[in-house]
């Protein structure tokens, strides 16, 4: 195992990094229940000492606390006999306080790792659209993909054990374990769900931290196996992985691999292996044969069952051929298809034509699931016929139009990377007519009569792209303009899936 030590260059927590005393500080929970920890405040203050002591952490929390001026009131008649306070409110405050305290060492380690790096600020790297340029570059050259649904551990002890390798304060971990079990008994904290949508709306930060700790552990092991199984390290894959997981690998992996993975089989050697993930869904793609993909499938199932004690079955990993199946990822249907092109080549006096058919990644708007989301939100019926939005009929005309425009622009912004715009035009058409019917219902008229009374440019913004009109109702738009805005655009300010697009 000395050979693997070189790959596991990991930071250690100092022995004086104790989190336990912060649990009994009122301002920790006041800060957590207020605006929360500003994730960028720590990144902007790079001048902190790398050997983050307890004094530095306390000063940091105190400074942020004085900026919030939040006072907690514990007066409530409904009290939990264990905590002594309101069961719902103060359990939420405690969970958020635990999360914000345990996050502090991770952010200070992140600051230390970013010192001297070329890129200190990573705002644009947080965009989920940054994944698609990577897919466009790599996936057309690959053959098979595995759609992976990452299982979530239902047992609380697994989550505590995951944190144990990162947080060295035993007192804090014991109290955290006790709190998790008590809180889960009172509020049903841990919920198992096949789609991993287990985050509670009342405690999103706490759930997010527990889930990210588990994912960080799993992906660190997976990345280690990936690097060991290939003679060539792919820079692009490594960079993308670091975007999604900002923490470094941790030291205990050497012991883990010695026990659970004594030998990495030679049949896993593949320099064309790529991996992307968002939330609980990931994609593993390879240029090799289905045999290798099935070997990785078996390996991942054993990893979850043996190391994390999480039950997983083969159905959670589906292997498909990229040229025949579409990937349902980030609310896009992505597929690899041939893009035939004829190139005229001339050499001296001779000219000839070359038929070229390179592979291209198609990203398509999933029209059927999206119409289902619109129907659920009462913009249309199940087959896509627009209907009036009854809940907005009592608003002013300006507010109604503004809200419909806001939804339309957000969807257009998110699906700007679609290679085929026809489906997006249909969604805009549904929203436009739904807006018309809502206004007509308010004015006690029909949609046709209402459209005759308003100006022709009244709903122009529904079909406005950034720079021109690209829609079915503007047939005279220039060919150059249509061609310019029919291409794909990936934005670096999208950090989550649009609500209507999130149909999973």
Curated annotation (Swiss-Prot):
GO molecular-function terms, A-Z: RNA binding
Main localization, broad class: plastid
Gene Ontology CC entries for this record: chloroplast
Compartments (UniProt record): Plastid, Chloroplast
InterPro entries the record matches: Domain_X, Maturase_MatK, Maturase_MatK_N
Gene Ontology terms describing biological process: mRNA processing; RNA splicing; tRNA processing
Keyword annotations: Chloroplast, mRNA processing, Plastid, RNA-binding, tRNA processing
Function: Usually encoded in the trnK tRNA gene intron. Probably assists in splicing its own and other chloroplast group II introns.
Membership in a protein family: Belongs to the intron maturase 2 family. MatK subfamily.
PANTHER family linked: MATURASE K (PTHR34811:SF1)
Protein's recorded name: Maturase K
Species annotation: Quercus gemelliflora (Pasang hiris)
Biological classification of the source: Eukaryota, Viridiplantae, Streptophyta, Embryophyta, Tracheophyta
Gene this protein is translated from: matK
């Amino acid at each position: 195992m000395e050979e693997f030590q070189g790959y596991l260059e990991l930071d250690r927590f100092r022995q004086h990094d104790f989190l336990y005393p912060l649990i009994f500080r009122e301002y920790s929970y006041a800060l957590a229940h207020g605006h929360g920890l500003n994730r960028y405040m720590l990144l902007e203050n790079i001048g902190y000492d790398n050997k983050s002591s307890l004094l530095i952490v306390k000063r940091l929390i105190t400074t942020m606390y004085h900026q919030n001026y939040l006072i907690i009131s514990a007066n409530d008649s409904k009290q939990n006999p264990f905590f002594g306070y309101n069961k719902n409110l103060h359990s939420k405050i405690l969970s958020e306080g635990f999360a914000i305290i345990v996050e502090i060492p991770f952010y200070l380690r992140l600051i230390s790792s970013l010192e001297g790096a070329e890129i200190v600020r990573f705002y644009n790297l947080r965009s989920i659209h940054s994944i698609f340029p990577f897919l466009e570059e790599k996936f057309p050259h690959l053959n098979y993909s595995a759609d992976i649904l990452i299982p979530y551990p239902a047992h609380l002890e697994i989550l505590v054990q995951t944190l144990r390798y990162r947080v060295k304060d035993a007192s804090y971990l014991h109290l955290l374990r006790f709190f998790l079990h008590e809180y889960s008994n009172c509020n049903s904290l841990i919920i198992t769900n096949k789609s991993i949508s287990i985050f509670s709306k009342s405690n999103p930060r706490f759930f997010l931290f527990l889930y990210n700790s588990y994912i960080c552990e799993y992906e660190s092991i997976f990345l280690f196996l990936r690097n060991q199984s290939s003679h060539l390290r792919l820079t692009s894959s490594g960079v993308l992985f670091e975007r999604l997981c900002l923490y470094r690998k941790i030291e205990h992996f050497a012991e883990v691999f010695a026990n659970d993975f004594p030998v990495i089989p030679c049949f896993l050697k593949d320099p064309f292996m790529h991996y992307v993930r968002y939330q609980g869904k990931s994609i593993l793609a390879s240029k090799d044969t289905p045999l290798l993909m099935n070997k990785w499938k078996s390996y991942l199932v054993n990893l979850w069952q043996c190391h994390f004690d999480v039950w997983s079955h083969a159905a959670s990993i589906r292997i498909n051929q990229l040229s025949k199946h579409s990937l349902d990822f980030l609310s896009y249907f992505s597929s690899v298809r041939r893009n035939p092109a004829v190139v005229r080549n001339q050499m001296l006096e001779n000219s000839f034509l070359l038929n070229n058919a390179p592979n291209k990644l198609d990203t398509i708007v999933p029209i059927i699931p999206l119409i289902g989301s619109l129907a659920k939100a009462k913009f249309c019926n199940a087959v896509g016929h627009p209907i009036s939005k009854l809940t907005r009929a009592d608003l002013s005309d300006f507010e109604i139009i503004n809200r419909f425009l806001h939804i339309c622009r957000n969807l257009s912004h998110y699906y700007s990377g679609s290679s085929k715009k026809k489906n997006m035009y249909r969604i805009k058409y549904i929203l436009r007519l739904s807006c018309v019917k809502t206004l007509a219902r308010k004015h006690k008229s029909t949609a046709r009569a209402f459209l005759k009374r308003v100006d022709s440019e009244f709903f122009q913004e529904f079909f406005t792209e950034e720079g021109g009109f690209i829609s079915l109702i503007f047939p005279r738009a220039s060919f150059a303009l249509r061609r310019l805005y029919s291409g794909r655009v990936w934005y670096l300010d999208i950090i989550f899936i649009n609500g209507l697009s999130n149909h999973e």
